[in-house]
């Protein structure tokens, strides 16, 4: 994973902050850490993969916090969810990303 562009991350952080204020939600470091890591990913991700990434980087963030933050980020349009025929949904960042299509290999279910 690489660092997100600072200008892009500042924009999405501002959007998220405004959303949290408007909804009267707390602005916690954990939520911003999750947002930062998501915007460091250049591909689709699943919640479990994100959790392991955060854990390996010594963040102390629970799965519940990740799931709750994912819901908030979906609501404010900063990420999108895809269902590619697997049990777990796949997510990707939405802001600052170019329109693209998804091709699914029906033999091995890869995207």
What label would you give each PLM region?
Residues 32-37:
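Pre-recognition alpha-helix immediately N-terminal to the DNA-recognition helix
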Residues 1-24:
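N-terminal leader segment of winged-helix/HTH proteins
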Residues 49-55, 66:
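A short acidic, leucine-rich amphipathic alpha-helix
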Residues 25, 39-42, 56-57:
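Short helix-capping/hinge SLiMs at alpha-helix to coil transitions
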């Amino acid at each position: 994973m690489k660092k997100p562009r600072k200008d892009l991350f500042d924009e999405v952080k501002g959007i998220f902050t405004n959303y949290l204020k408007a909804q009267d939600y707390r602005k916690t470091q954990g939520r911003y850490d999750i947002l930062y890591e998501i915007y460091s990913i250049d591909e689709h991700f699943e919640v479990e993969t994100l959790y392991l990434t955060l854990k390996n980087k010594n963040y102390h963030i629970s799965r519940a916090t990740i799931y709750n933050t994912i819901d908030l980020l979906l609501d404010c349009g900063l990420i999108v969810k895809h269902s590619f025929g697997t049990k777990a949904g796949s997510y990707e960042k939405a802001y600052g990303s170019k329109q693209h299509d998804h091709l699914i290999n029906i033999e091995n279910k890869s995207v």
